Design a protein with these regions (language model features):
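Short aromatic-glycine-(Arg/Gly/Cys) micro-motifs in beta-strand/loop hairpins
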Residues: 2-24, 86-87
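A short, charged, amphipathic alpha-helix used as a generic interaction element across diverse proteins
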Residues: 30-50
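Polybasic, lysine/arginine-rich low-complexity segments
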Residues: 3-4, 15, 32, 41, ...
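Short, mixed-charge low-complexity intrinsically disordered segments
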Residues: 1, 44-112
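A generic structural signal for ordered secondary structure
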Residues: 5-7, 25-32, 108-111
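A short, exposed loop/beta-hairpin motif centered on an aromatic-Gly-Thr core
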Residues: 18-32, 99-101
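A general secondary-structure boundary signal
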Residues: 8-11, 38, 42, 95-98
Length: 112
């Protein structure tokens, strides 16, 4: 594993009836999978689950050179079939989105 594979910085937030909740950050030299798992754990442990279906990204980094490091944003959305987590990563080529469904057995499936 190279250093290029590490360095994901993730933001999680919940949007409920009272507006956006406090943002929590997970930073460090992590792989995408590690960062996603940490962010999901943070989401569930802090009850950040109230995002309605018209969720939107409110954090836009990568606009300047100082934020050119690869990072991601995790959104947790409620679905009829269960919880789904949207992982958006940003790099020099732009935005990429992945959808992970958290199954009952705790395993994630990438539905990109």
């Amino acid at each position: 594993m190279t250093k290029k594979d590490l360095g994901y910085s993730l933001t999680t937030y919940g949007r409920g009836k009272t507006g956006y909740k406090t943002r929590k950050y997970v930073e460090g030299l992590l792989t995408k999978e590690q960062a996603l798992r940490k962010a999901i754990k943070l989401c569930t442990s802090t009850n950040l689950v109230d995002i309605d279906k018209d969720w939107e990204t409110v954090d836009r980094y990568g606009e300047s050179e100082e934020h050119s490091r690869t990072f991601g944003t995790v959104h947790m959305v409620k679905r009829k079939t269960g919880n789904a987590y949207i992982l958006q990563t940003f790099d020099k080529d732009g935005w990429e989105s992945y959808t992970y469904d958290l199954k009952a057995d705790g395993k994630m499936t990438n539905r990109r």
